[in-house]
């Protein structure tokens, strides 16, 4: 049984009405933007939030941080997970937490929230989506949640699995 959902480390943050409204389905890759968390800190000068349309037919509500070097970087789920400490230092998805905090700090200034609050909001939105699929699999196969262990694969496994396991009370 395979089910697909557009949530991963590169999933971009959607901002509407001055707050996080969604995560994904567009990714940094689709938008052709670097992840904030995989960017050198020295590139994060004078950060300002801009809202873009990753593809021509998308709405302009995906957050990027535009910097003094003329480049802009996507705010991503990987950035949020790194800031919150869910990604181990030696993991493929581990990045530059300082850069991510600078980028998310620009969003915090715009929204009147804190960096940690915003990261948790983004993770909660994304994991609610993933959690619904896990709940459906549990129901479809009549599984005992106490016997389940979540296992992730790919570069985004540590971005998704630890937070999802914690949120759902399932081992990982």
Language-model regions, residue ranges each:
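N-terminally biased helix-coil "hinge/interface" segments that flank
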Residues: 1-172
